[in-house]
Design a protein with these regions (language model features):
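Periplasmic/extracellular, small/polar-rich flexible segments of pilin-like filament-forming proteins
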Residues: 55-170
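Amphipathic alpha-helical segments typified by the pilin-like N-terminal helix
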Residues: 1-48
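Extended, polar beta-sheet/loop recognition surfaces of beta-rich domains
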Residues: 39-64
Length: 170
């Protein structure tokens, strides 16, 4: 009688089929995890922007900071300006939004859905992962963030997939 060593063709096919099933389940689970991570990253960028603007603006009122929102110690927005007549004008929401969405912005967050793009932009339309910041009046900044789980089309029109906050600059 021969002493056969090794696996039969059927045994090998069963192992390959099991590995295929495990791989398929793993890919679906991985996509769910990455979708949730992107959604949470967009929410975190939104919350951090609100805290950043509030903290930086409070520097104008707490101490005598001349400039806020600097990048690497340079640039920024002046807390106030004084004209030749001695009239003081304080920083407006429009100046803050223009600075935060310009080329000299201190913000370095990337859109979690498209890492080639900056997360914060000045726009009234929200694409997935973008934090849209607009000056809605002289003293109000509106922050709108859209996120999606990627299961359907553009879910940014669904208010359940948006965060909206208003920051008052007084």
């Amino acid at each position: 009688m021969k002493n056969n060593k090794g696996f039969t063709l059927i045994e090998l096919l069963v192992v390959v089929a099991i590995i295929g099933i495990l791989a398929a389940v793993g890919v679906v689970a991985y996509n769910g995890y990455t979708g949730a991570a992107k959604k949470n990253a967009a929410k975190t960028i939104h919350a951090n922007l609100i805290k950043y603007v509030a903290a930086e603006y409070s520097k104008c009122t707490i101490d005598d900071s001349d400039t806020i929102m600097k990048k690497g110690g340079t640039g920024g927005v002046g807390c106030s300006t004084t004209d030749d007549a001695g009239n003081v004008t304080f920083v407006t929401a429009t100046e803050i939004v223009t600075h935060l969405t310009g080329t000299d912005t201190p913000l370095e967050d990337k859109n979690p859905y498209s890492t080639a793009s900056a997360a914060v932009r000045s726009s009234t339309s929200a694409g997935a992962g973008f934090v849209s910041i607009t000056a809605t009046s002289e003293n109000l900044i509106t922050v709108l963030t859209c996120f999606t789980d990627g299961k359907t089309g553009n879910e940014c029109t669904d208010t359940g997939n948006q965060l909206t906050n208003t920051i008052s600059i007084d």
